[in-house]
């Protein structure tokens, strides 16, 4: 009796016994593993993303009224009521225009936003919270990495690649998303006067942003910029994408003071201005100040909503530690709770953390670094010990912070 011939996959060489299915063709066979690999290759070449179809409903837009938007933001961001109101109205108007079904001759323009405020005052957190509430794709990009087309660096179009990646390449969802451009102040042109040398990472980038902000169809490399020149491009319409820009604009308070003082007349007015300056000059910021800082008029014209964030004082920082839904102390308490340890703090510890955050000029973002420097040793040691409770005293916090490397980083 003739020996039965063993069948093999013509692609990977596996035998019939090593695979689940072996599909026969005219002159060969293919196993289920090679079929899956072939499907992946086809998807990459033809820009077919099955997961985008599978998750298409996960980014269903849910628009709320301005009061509801602010109420939601109050749960995550402490203070900054003026900024919350302005953002709530701008976001509501932006997405309301998408739902208008009656065709008429009145075209409602986009409400792109600029937020001015010191580092750690909540610009990024506000934008993140809005995107979470609306259930839309969200991408954060750093303006400092962009350069004008043709120079080393990333093209401005690459920010849309991140938006596509955030929604599994669902173009329809991405076209209703939010892009937060951080450090927008770092691409300010160097002076108001034209320069002979080309400013490829400043004014050149601002010029590149104009069409994106206004609304246009862009061919986007889905894997990002210039590293994959062979990839297929995806067409994205930015007409309904909301752009929120944030920056510290260090020194803009002097420009505001100069402008406000110029229009002040009389001794009493100047006295009141001095009181205002002692508090927060950012409340007077407008497009004129941003233009003098270095943003081009064309860019400012496409970002009509300007808001400011107040510097954080001690009471606000104290509340940030404990009050929001995802407050820092709640996060660390939960981490210890997972280990079966009940974490508690002396009230004076919170005041100590706030004092250091103000002293080191770190804002709310610095509170986490301070918490980490105080609790790192306990998070390292306690999981290996049979401890059920742990209280952070003021003496413990001072000792641990004093021996940490962070204590050496004090701002002069």
Task: Describe these PLM feature segments.
Residues 2-24, 29-33, 40-79, 84-139, ...:
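AAA+ P-loop NTPase nucleotide-binding core of proteostasis motors
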């Amino acid at each position: 009796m003739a020996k039965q011939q063993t069948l093999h996959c013509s692609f990977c060489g596996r035998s019939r016994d090593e695979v689940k299915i072996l599909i026969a063709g005219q002159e060969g066979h293919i196993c289920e593993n090679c079929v899956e690999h072939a499907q992946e290759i086809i998807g990459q070449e033809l820009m077919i993303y099955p997961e985008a179809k599978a998750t298409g409903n996960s980014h269903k837009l849910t628009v709320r009224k301005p009061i509801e938007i602010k109420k939601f933001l109050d749960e995550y961001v402490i203070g900054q009521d003026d900024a919350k109101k302005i953002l709530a109205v701008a976001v509501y108007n932006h997405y309301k225009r998408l739902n208008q079904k009656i065709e008429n001759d009145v075209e409602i323009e986009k409400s792109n936003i600029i937020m001015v405020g010191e580092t750690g005052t909540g610009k990024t957190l506000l934008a993140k919270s809005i995107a979470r509430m609306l259930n839309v794709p969200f991408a954060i990009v750093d303006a400092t990495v962009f350069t004008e087309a043709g120079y080393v660096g990333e093209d401005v179009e690459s920010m849309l690649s991140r938006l596509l990646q955030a929604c599994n390449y669902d173009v329809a969802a991405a076209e209703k998303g939010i892009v937060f451009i951080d450090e927008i102040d770092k691409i300010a042109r160097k002076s108001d006067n034209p320069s002979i040398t080309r400013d490829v990472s400043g004014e050149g980038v601002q010029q590149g942003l104009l069409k994106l902000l206004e609304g246009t169809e862009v061919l986007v490399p889905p894997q990002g910029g210039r590293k994959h020149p062979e990839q297929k491009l995806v067409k994205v319409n930015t007409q309904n994408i909301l752009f929120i820009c944030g920056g510290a604009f260090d020194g803009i308070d002097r420009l505001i003071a100069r402008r406000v003082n110029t229009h002040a007349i009389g001794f009493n007015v100047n006295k009141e201005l001095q009181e205002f300056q002692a508090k927060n000059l950012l409340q007077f910021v407008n497009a004129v100040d941003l233009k003098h800082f270095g943003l081009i008029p064309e860019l400012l014209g496409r970002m009509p909503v300007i808001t400011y964030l107040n510097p954080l004082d001690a009471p606000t920082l104290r509340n940030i530690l404990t009050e929001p839904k995802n407050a820092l102390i709640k996060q660390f308490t939960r981490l210890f709770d997972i280990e079966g340890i009940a974490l508690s703090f002396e009230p004076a510890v919170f005041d100590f953390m706030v004092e250091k955050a103000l002293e080191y000029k770190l804002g709310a973002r610095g509170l986490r670094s301070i918490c980490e420097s105080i609790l790192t040793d306990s998070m390292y040691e306690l999981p290996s010990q049979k401890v059920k409770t742990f209280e952070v005293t003021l003496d413990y916090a001072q000792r641990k912070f004093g021996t940490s490397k962070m204590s050496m980083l004090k701002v002069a």
